[in-house]
Amino acid sequence: MKYGELIKERRTVLGLTQQDLSDYTELSLRIIKSVESEKGNPSLKTLEKIAGVLGLELIMRVNIINE
């Protein structure tokens, strides 16, 4: 599942609207919509705010690519 789908699904399960999530995170409605539709490139700070409100844990995985 992609991150936008996961965020939308969790928001829906919690009975929150996009506007609710916008209010709780203090992010604009436009940002919430763009994150859920995976348009643009949200910052780590933005994803942390959303994850915090939705009760999700944000895990970052770093892979080393041989050059």
Annotate each predicted stretch with a short phrase.
Residues 45-61:
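DNA major-groove recognition helix of helix-turn-helix/homeodomain DNA-binding modules
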Residues 26-41:
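Recognition helix of helix-turn-helix/homeodomain-like DNA-binding domains
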